[in-house]
From Swiss-Prot:
PANTHER family: PTHR28255, UPF0303 PROTEIN YBR137W
Descriptive protein name: UPF0303 protein Bmul_1674/BMULJ_01570
Entries under Pfam families matching the protein: HbpS-like
Top-rank taxon, per record: Bacteria
Coiled coil feature spans: none
SUPFAM superfamilies associated with the record: GlcG-like
Family that this chain belongs to: Belongs to the UPF0303 family.
Lineage, broadest ranks: Bacteria, Pseudomonadati, Pseudomonadota, Betaproteobacteria, Burkholderiales
Family matches, as InterPro entries: PduO/GlcC-like (IPR005624), PduO/GlcC-like_sf (IPR038084), YBR137W-like (IPR010371)
Length: 165
């Protein structure tokens, strides 16, 4: 895995995956799409869609644990703080050889710079929340979110997917 290349690719994902509008009905549709895909693949994940301070969708598939819900919360906090995907922030910390605590004073009990939380961006409004998955290895959590956002927004996942590691 080339961190610099992944960071560039994640930046392209964040630029491309923008909703023209977003409301609770769209959150429900996206959440159900994610749930159905995760169930079809046998993924034991927790799925969360929220605007900042307002939960819109949550689902825990069979095999997901309360730990997954806590990871969701901590990853979501990273997006809320940085307005970037949690995976991008984690890779930036890895690249710099530091941690969120050392660099930004953010406690790891509240912030998880691991893949799986992606900014929910609306054209003309910016980042309004996050779409988060927890239960797979972090790169796969991130890519699962990107794949389903691509499907929801009519984007070509093959173009936006991270390089295979």
């Amino acid at each position: 895995m080339d961190i610099a290349h992944d960071l560039q690719s994640i930046g392209a994902q964040e630029q491309a995956l923008v909703f023209p509008h977003f409301d609770p009905a769209r959150a429900w549709a996206l959440g159900n799409r994610m749930h159905a895909l995760a169930a079809s693949r046998g993924h034991a994940v927790a799925i969360d869609i929220a605007t900042f301070g307002h939960p819109l969708f949550f689902s825990a598939l069979p095999g997901a644990t309360p730990d997954n819900a806590d990871w969701v919360r901590r990853k979501r906090n990273v997006v809320a703080h940085f307005r970037r995907s949690s995976y991008a922030i984690g890779l930036r910390m890895q690249q710099a050889g530091t941690t969120l605590t050392d660099k930004h004073g953010l406690p790891l009990a509240e912030y998880a710079p691991h893949g799986g939380a992606f900014p929910l961006t609306v054209a003309g409004a910016g980042v309004i929340g996050s779409v988060t998955v927890s239960g797979l290895p972090q790169r796969l959590d991130h890519e699962f979110v990107v794949e389903t956002l691509c499907a929801e927004l009519g984007q070509d996942y093959g173009v936006l997917a991270l390089a295979r590691s």
